[in-house]
Amino acid sequence: MLNYTELENKNVLVVGLAKSGYEAAKLLLKLGANVKVNDGKDLSQDAHAKDLESMGIEVISGSHPFSLLDDDPIIVKNPGIPYTVSIIKEATNRGLKILTEVELSYLISEAPIIAVTGTNGKTTVTSLIGDMFQKSVLTGRLSGNIGYVASKVAQEVKSDEYLITELSSFQLLGIEEYKPHIAIITNIYSAHLDYHETLENYQNAKKQIYKNQTKDDYLICNYHQRHLIESENLEAKTFYFSTQQEVDGIYIKDGFIVFNGIRIINTKDLVLPGEHNLENILAAVLASIIAGVPVKAIVDSLVTFSGIDHRLQYIGTNRTNKYYNDSKATNTLATQFALNSFDQPIIWLCGGLDRGNEFDELIPYMENVRVMVVFGETQDKFAKLGNSQGKYVIKATDVEDAVDKIQDIVEPNDVVLLSPACASWDQYHTFEERGEKFIDRFRAHLPSY
C-alpha cells in the first residue's frame, strides 16, 4: 500500500482538472510532490488552472502529450476521465501507477468511512445519513459525488468522526486499497454504458466498494438484488433492506420500520415521499444504527427530512396542491419512480433535451397522470405520448410557462410534479437551474396576504 508520506518529491501527474483534479493537485503539492496537471480541454482562461499556476504547478492543456509520462509519474486520475483516454491507456501500457482521487483521499485520512453507491438513491441516502449524524452527538462529514471533493474533506475530518461518502461508478473504478467500514449499494440498474461499455463492467465497478472489506466491516444491500453479490467471496458482515418482506437486516412490517425486532418508526410519520425512498430510508437507518447513531436522533431526522434539492423535493403547497421539484430526473427510470410515488391525480411537467429516446416505457406509470404540460426539445414526443394515453396535454415554452399555464386548470388535491425525464441543456445550463426556475415560479403564484 502506498503511504501518503511516500509522495514527497515524487513526480505526480493529475489528469483531468475540474473540482476534484484541482483539490487533488493542491493536496499533492502540500504533501511535497512534484505536481503537473494535464487536461484535454483548453484551460488558458480557467480560474482553477490559473490558481494552480500561481502556486507553481505546471498546467498542460488542450491535448494529452505522452511526453508527460517520460519521468515515470504516479498518475492521479479525475473520475470523469475514462480509462480509454489516450494518455491513461499509454500510462497503463508503461506500467505506471494510476490512483483515483478517492484513493488519494483514503490514503490521507484515518476516519472510518460510510460509502454509498448505486444507480439511484445514493445522494438521498448519503444526505439522510448526514442528517441523522447531525441530529446526534456524533460527527459525520459529507464528501464525494455529493459535491464535496473527497480529497479536500479528508484533510479536515478527524479520526473519531465519520467520512460519509457518495461514490459514483467512475470514482469506484480503479480503486486499490480503499476500504469503507460501512458500504451501501442502493441498487444497480443499467446506466453509464457510454463510459463502461457493458452492463457487466458497470456492475463490477459498483462492486469495487466492498472488495477490500474485512470481517470487521459491514455491507448493506438491496435484498431484491442479492443475486448480484451472492456469488461473491464476501468477508464483511452483510445485511439487507426490503420494503416487501422480513430479511436479515431492516424491513417494513405492519407499517413500521423494523430492525432486530424493534419498531423504529411508523412509515406514516415519514416526510420523504415514494416507495423508492422507503428503500433509501431503510438503508440510511441501518447504516446509522451500525455507526452508533441513537434511535432518537434517527427518528428526529426521519420526521423532518424532506429530501434533496431537485430530487423529488417537496417545495410547498398552493391552495390544496402540493408541488414537487424532481428536476434531477434526467432519465426515464428516475421519472418512473417519481410517477409511482403518488396516489393523487398528477399534473406532470416534462420534457427537455432530445437524445433520441422514446418514452413508451413510462406508459405503465402514467395511470395517475391527469394533465401533461410538455416543453423543450422533446415536447412533441411527450405530447404524442400523452395523446396516445388519453391525457390532457398542454404545450409550454419552458418550465416557467408550464407553471403559469396550470394555474387555471389545477383541481383540488392535484399533485404538481416537475419530473422532466430529460436533461436540461436544451434550455438551461443545469438541472439545478431548471429546478430553481420552477421553484421561483411556484412562489410567484403564492397568494399574498
Swiss-Prot record:
Localisation per UniProt entry: Cytoplasm
Binding residues annotated for ATP, in chain numbering: 118-124
Main location: cytoplasm
Enzyme class: ligase
Keywords: ATP-binding, Cell cycle, Cell division, Cell shape, Cell wall biogenesis/degradation, Cytoplasm, Ligase, Nucleotide-binding, Peptidoglycan synthesis
Catalysed reaction, written as an equation: UDP-N-acetyl-alpha-D-muramoyl-L-alanine + D-glutamate + ATP = UDP-N-acetyl-alpha-D-muramoyl-L-alanyl-D-glutamate + ADP + phosphate + H(+)
Source species, domain of life: Bacteria
Biological pathway: Cell wall biogenesis; peptidoglycan biosynthesis
GO cellular component: cytoplasm
EC number(s) recorded for this UniProt protein: 6.3.2.9
Entry's Gene Ontology molecular function annotations: ATP binding; UDP-N-acetylmuramoylalanine-D-glutamate ligase activity
Transmembrane segments: none
Gene Ontology BP annotations: cell division; cell wall organization; peptidoglycan biosynthetic process; regulation of cell shape
InterPro entries: Mur-like_cat_sf (IPR036565), Mur_ligase_C (IPR004101), Mur_ligase_C_dom_sf (IPR036615), Mur_ligase_cen (IPR013221), MurD (IPR005762)
NCBIfam families attached to this UniProt entry: murD
Similarity annotation: Belongs to the MurCDEF family.
The protein's role, per its UniProt record: Cell wall formation. Catalyzes the addition of glutamate to the nucleotide precursor UDP-N-acetylmuramoyl-L-alanine (UMA).
Name of this protein: UDP-N-acetylmuramoylalanine--D-glutamate ligase
This protein's encoding gene: murD
